């Protein structure tokens, strides 16, 4: 009853939902203009998401949404580009009276054109339209509908890919190119309108996290925290959770992508909450780590502060022109120094024999002992996808104004950490030295993740939920 009461009281205390924000129709048109300018001449073909099998909620594919703003299923987009001119058409599903009993009537062509500013036709006219364009000699640029592919089958094809393969087979000599690299470059920098959408998604996430901080106590179930967050996101005008929430307590805090959320939280646990609200299709991604009792133990505080220092180091160097590599190094060096200080490694630069030794050729850090405690990337872009552009966690590149991204260092001391290591003389010597520290800090997983915007001078912190040790403990003391 106290848990239910806390949810009700917190909902009464929340401000009224702000007026809905949207991406203007003119911005979608500008995006299409930018894509057209990059290809100069050709035919762009993109397929939207399909109607879900069963009662699942439909979510439009990000690339399709980015270009059209159209949110109905079973649509296709064709844009013919010639020097100095372009013509775009949406092909939308036909009205089926019986299907409408289940899913409602889709908008007709006139309504689609009014909503999107794009000429609209029935999807049944798509094959003939493409046939007529195949004879123009223009190259075809395709946008693959990744989200409908079966990732477990390397030879699987999405609906769009299968259609285009058949189409190309029927038109020998047709040039087909991948438009995704071009679109990716356009999606990397976020416009002011996109930044506003992301700020709203982030604010919703921060509000939900504050609710959970105030309600958290030993004996709660992980799924109760997840339910509180989902409720907060929806009550305040969000799309809901932008991805499956991670609520990992105790040993689950050391599993990066744990999401069963079915464990009862113990008194001495830390809880990693990696969550994000969606708003208008845009995804936030924020992580906070809480002490179940409301106060971090001395060992938990020690690990937490290393992670926080690593995040601060990365945020400090993030500005226009900063290389992704130097940004990653700033955080990694803090983590390496910290875990060495705790006795979890033999030294800052100490190495080991990993089971993934082949990866060390291109990424030498993967062979350092500190990598055992943070094997994931430092951050990623956010936007229409929770892992959006830019991709600063690997490869080369520099930050530029308009980049919106996460910084999410972590340290995870799994009780099974030493069991995954190959039995080599080097590893045996390391294990003998670090085992006492691993036993001391085991089941402590700490991750702190925040969202940032690159401005003209640096990185603006967007996700302003309590994160310093004292701030987290003070927020948790504000019981509902």
Predicted ranges, named:
Residues 3, 20-480:
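Active-site neighborhoods and metal-handling regions in enzymes and metal-associated proteins
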Residues 6-17:
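Bacterial N-terminal signal peptides
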